[in-house]
């Protein structure tokens, strides 16, 4: 009910208000900068016919303007475009290596990516056997780029727990 009242108030005397707005005097142009004002006055005094050309309405241009027809359509919303692109999946997949940790139900992994379990495994293998698990071999094995593997090996390390016995106390030996 409130929408009907609001619509009636909004549309009340709409045509008269529109006509009044159209017939209202247009705002005057902004004042010119003093440095250009002298140049304009000089040009107007040397060429008085320009003043008449500026104020004259061109009937030919007005008739062409009346023939202009504009047909517009709403653009496709960006949400629809994003939805269409989000549905596409990468075409190449590979199966995950070693299913010893089935914490997550990963069916396939896009080429060029690895799972967390695989990342920890390859970091541990490289740490334990750096001669056999080189960056080149890891890149071939997991279908990764060489530069990404080098960065992974350089900046990421596996979690280690080291327990140091307190100084001054001897560690309790196990029986």
Curated annotation (Swiss-Prot):
One of its GO terms (biological process) is mitochondrial respiratory chain complex I assembly. It is found in: Mitochondrion; Membrane. It holds the Pfam family UPF0240. Transmembrane segments: none annotated. Phosphorylated on serine. Prolactin stimulate serine phosphorylation. It is a lipid-anchor. A lipid is attached at residue 2 (N-myristoyl glycine). GO terms for molecular function: calmodulin binding. Residues 16-37 are annotated as: Disordered. The modification Phosphoserine is found at residue 35. Keywords: Calmodulin-binding, Lipoprotein, Membrane, Mitochondrion, Myristate, Phosphoprotein. GO terms for cellular component: cytosol; mitochondrial membrane; mitochondrion. The keyword Lipoprotein applies. Involved in the assembly of mitochondrial NADH:ubiquinone oxidoreductase complex (complex I). May be involved in cell proliferation and survival of hormone-dependent tumor cells. May be a regulator of breast tumor cell invasion. Belongs to the NDUFAF4 family. Binds calmodulin. Interacts with NDUFAF3. This is NADH dehydrogenase [ubiquinone] 1 alpha subcomplex assembly factor 4.
């Amino acid at each position: 009910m409130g929408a009907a009242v609001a619509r009636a108030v909004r549309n009340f005397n709409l045509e008269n208000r529109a006509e009044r707005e159209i017939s209202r005097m247009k705002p005057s142009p902004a004042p010119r900068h003093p440095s250009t004002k002298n140049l304009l006055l000089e040009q107007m005094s040397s060429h008085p016919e320009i003043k008449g050309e500026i104020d004259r309405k061109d009937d030919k241009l007005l008739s062409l303007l009346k023939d202009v027809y504009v047909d517009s359509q709403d653009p496709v919303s960006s949400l629809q475009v994003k939805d269409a692109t989000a549905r596409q999946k990468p075409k190449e997949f590979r199966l995950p290596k070693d299913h010893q940790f089935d914490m997550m139900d990963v069916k396939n992994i896009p080429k060029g990516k690895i799972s967390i379990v695989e990342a920890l495994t390859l970091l541990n293998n490289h740490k334990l056997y750096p001669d056999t698990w080189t960056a080149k071999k890891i890149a071939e094995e997991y279908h990764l780029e060489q530069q990404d593997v080098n960065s992974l090996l350089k900046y990421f390390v596996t979690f280690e727990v080291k327990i140091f016995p307190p100084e001054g106390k001897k560690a309790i030996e196990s029986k």
